[in-house]
Amino acid sequence: MPMQHQAPVSDMAQQAASCELPGRMFRAYDIRGIVGRDLTEDNIRVIGQAIGYLALSHGHNEVLFGADGRLSSPSLSAALGEGILDSGCHIIDLGTIPTPLLYFATHTTDYHSGVMLTASHNPADYNGIKIVRERSCLTSEEIQGIREQACFFARRPDKVREPRLPRGSRRALDIMPAYIDRIRQDVKLKRPLRVVVDCGNAVPGLVAPSLYRALGCEVIELYCQLDGSFPNHHPDPTINVNLKDLVAQVKTHSADLGVALDGDGDRVVLVTDQGRVMDTDRLLMLLVDQILPGYCATAEDRRPSVVFDVKCSSLLINRI
């Protein structure tokens, strides 16, 4: 892909220094801000142009595209998509989906780059962008590169697309059936479970109840109707006060398990049949106990590696 759209590094740095795109939006691994103050339709469009340019510069002329169910997502999604198309990059539109479905699509389709409009577990007045290139999240340096390129395009809209390159096009792809089918193949329950699923009125409500029913569970839905104002509780299950209704429903229905998902479905907290909130360390220990023995039995040539974040305690390390 020709690189003539990119300004010299010194020019881009100067553009970024005077750019109206707030630097606070461009975080270590994603882009996130308050709608109307940080994220507007105008600035998210030039960010889309920069994302499209990034994909094209790495040889990808098609990107997967999804959005969560926030109130601001329809308008911002339209603007972000227009920016990507401006660059000459094509969009494979996954529609309104949880983030894990975008990640799944990058690993199971021919399209290895993707863009997700979401602010994850943040309050309703936030929105943001998660970017995947070659099946991996961007580094902080690459995120800053997106800002610099977007600032350049804001000043020089004539440079957004190489003159001989036509504007991009869009087509739809329904990834949910393949996602559910893949999990159904991998997960076999020893007995049917009664599960309370709390989606916090966020986008996981479009997928999670169907997924658990496909696994043979009896599902009691709690706040699974999509409402981007999040009227019942903040969509962050790692805060215990947001779990009180789930705990109560698990006890009321004598459920085997409670499942709470965050605003875009990439965080989960479990509640036991006794109404006890299971912390992340304990959940990971259960997964380690289930996964590692089978892995070690089939991978005699090397020891397995386990990746976990810095918030995990030494209890998990000792268990591994």
What is the role of each PLM region?
Residues 60-64, 192-196, 218, 302-305:
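Residues that mark the start of a beta-strand
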Residues 73-78, 143, 205-209, 317:
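Short, surface-exposed alpha-helical segments at coil->helix boundaries
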Residues 101, 144-181, 185, 273-320:
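Proline/glycine-rich low-complexity loops and linkers
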Residues 131-134, 269-273:
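Short beta-strand-to-turn element immediately C-terminal to the catalytic PLP-Schiff-base lysine
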